[in-house]
Every structure is written in structure tokens, then in C-alpha cells.
Amino acid sequence: MASALLSALAVSGAANAYQAEVGGSYNYLDPDNGSSVSKFGVDGTYYFNPVQTRNAPLAEAAFLSRASNVNALINYGDNSGTKDTQYGVGVEYYVPNSDFYLSGDVGRNEREVDNTNIDSKVTTYAAEVGYLPAPGLLLALGVKGYDEKDGKDGADPTVRAKYVTQVGQHDVNLEAFGAFGDLDEYKVRGDYYIDKTLSVGADYYNNDLTDKDEFGINAKKFLNQQVSVEGRVGFGDNDNTYGVRAAYRF
């Protein structure tokens, strides 16, 4: 009887595990002045080991499991002859048998306007070293930089924190990020989990370099263990943004 119960639990746990996630997104920018902009994107993450969902919020399962991974994304828009492309790859590595964390990413932003000389290319990069002093808590220091083709370049120190914990009978996710120097960028975010499958949240983002200042609200719902949908609305000084994404885990 005991062995049969353990076998059933093992099968149940394996059924809720996943090792990859792929997603598709659509974003719409509605500026106060000028034409609207639409972008489509795809993204993917592969985990080195299967991620067990256990009793955690499904959106935080990989983080709480300290699941090392590689990830990639690409976004593309062609609006009235203005082509915008962003793509990048990254890695997160939780050092085995320790509480240390490493991450890095590199990306490329390209913008091209038909019948003009506008053809900008910017390479971006970032790296972090982090520590997890308690379950669900990550503290990280790093560097974030950019290099424009035939233009400026720079790199600035960064600090980041993420904390997933319980408040009463519900889970919450709290995040903060800052980059100091030429970038002068910071971001805060909070998510409240109504249950393990549904969250609502808010965020604020400010970047002096790009003159971006935006407050956003978001929601995410897992329709089952594999399929999720999410949306966000952002309210900026000069524009509003709308985004949706659907993803599948396997």
C-alpha cells in the first residue's frame, strides 16, 4: 500500500512538471502625438532540469525551484515603413549546492526607416551575481550596458531584488530594480496571487535616458498547468501601451 501511494504521488508530481515554455505576444503603442505602433513577439525558455510546480503559484514555480535556464526572444514591428526589431538571448544559473546565482544576457535593437538614412543598431548586455539568503528571496548586483553602432556606449552598475512570500493565505511577488549612472533607470513591481493560477499586479518604470515614465497594471491566468494568458496596460506621460501574451509549457 505504501509503495503504491508513493508511486501515485510520483506520477502526479511528474504530470505537473515542465521543462520548457514558449510564448507569443502582441504589443500596441498609442502615442499622444504621432502614429500608433504594433509589435509581435515570440519567446522561449528551456530549463536544464524539469520544474516541479508543487504548491507554489504557477507563475513563480521556476524561481522558487531555483531552475537554471537559457532563454531567447524576438520582437518585430513594421509600421508605415518604420521597422523595429529586438532580439536577445540570456541565461540564469543557480549554482548547485549553494545559495549563489549568476545571470547574463545580450541583445540587439535595430530601427530602420524606409527612404531615409535612419538605420540605428544598438547592442545591449547585462550580467548579475546574486545571493538567495532565504527561501523566495534573491538579491543581486550587476552591470548593464549598451553600445550604439557609430555612436555612444556606456555601462552602469545595477541592483535588483525579488521576493516571493505569503501574506495570510495568499502569495505575493515583490520586485525592484535600479541602474545608476548614465542610464538612471529604475523599476518596481508587485503581484498579488488570488490563487495559485491567477494574479493581479501593478508596476512603475522610469528611464531618464529614454525619457520614459510609465505606470502599469497587469493580470495573468493559468487556464491549466500548461497554458497561460496575460495582459498589461501601461499609462505614460506621452503614450499608453497595451500588451497581451499567451504561453504553453511542456
Outline where the language-model segments fall.
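Cleavable N-terminal export/targeting peptides
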Residues: 1-21, 33-36, 52-56, 64-67
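Subset of outer-membrane beta-barrel
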Residues: 27, 42, 72-79, 83-86, ...
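Mid-chain, structured segments of secreted extracytoplasmic proteins
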Residues: 54-88
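Feature captures outer-membrane beta-barrel proteins of Gram-negative bacteria and organelles
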Residues: 39-51, 59-61, 86-97, 124-134, ...
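Active-site beta-loop-alpha junctions enriched in small/polar residues
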Residues: 27, 75-77, 107, 144, ...
